[in-house]
A protein has these predicted regions:
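C-terminal "cap" of GNAT-fold acetyltransferases
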Residues: 12-13, 54, 118-121, 125-169
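Short coil/turn segments at alpha/beta junctions that flank glycine-rich nucleotide-binding fingerprints
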Residues: 98, 114-118
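Active-site acidic-Proline motif in GNAT/NAT acetyltransferases
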Residues: 92-94, 98, 126
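Acetyl-CoA-dependent GNAT
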Residues: 3-87, 92-94, 105-107, 111, ...
Length: 169
């Protein structure tokens, strides 16, 4: 699937990002009995170097997938200094199973590392087994709950330490 696929950083309020965000919200509503993701997000949260919003496009410039990270530091929602929180990972149904989410995830991790973040964190839910499988296979492990959904039984929080870039001697 990678042939003709390209990743592009866009603002959170870009029309293609809004289109995919609406689709992921519908999927959340289907999986979680009418509830979408109510986490407050602001476009400024994804402006480099404090975050990044990526879209994957096919050769016809159709948006197929999204993913983002935003900087988090110690606060009353359970984050730690140096955290980079993954948000809005989504692949349209017809493009699933072809490595797009893994490719976006790797790019988000690399960008967060370059921005000096020390740990990637994310919230997903128990009704998203394919997301949980992706994150486990990419080196994430279950962590203490944090964020907006930390009190929800269905919430699954995960974390992965980021490797700091090595310097050449």
């Amino acid at each position: 699937m990678s042939h003709g696929i390209h990743l592009r950083a866009v603002p959170y309020d870009h029309p293609d990002a809004l289109k995919l965000d609406a689709q992921v919200q519908l999927e959340y509503q289907e999986r979680y009995d009418g509830e979408g993701d109510a986490t407050f997000l602001d476009p400024a949260m994804f402006v480099p170097p404090a975050g990044l919003y990526l879209l994957a496009y096919d050769a016809s410039d159709t948006p197929l997938a999204s993913g983002a990270w935003r900087a988090q530091d110690h606060n009353d929602e359970g984050y730690s200094d140096g955290d980079a929180e993954i948000k809005r990972m989504y692949v349209v149904p017809e493009a699933r199973g072809k490595g797009l989410a893994r490719r976006i995830l790797a790019e988000l991790e690399a960008d967060a590392t370059a921005a000096g973040r020390r740990r990637m964190v994310l919230e997903t839910g128990d009704r998203q087994p394919e997301a949980i499988a992706l994150y486990l296979s990419a080196g994430y492990s279950l962590s203490e709950k944090f964020g907006y959904y930390r009190a929800y039984e269905s919430s699954r929080c995960m974390a992965k330490p980021l490797r700091t870039p090595t310097t050449l001697s």
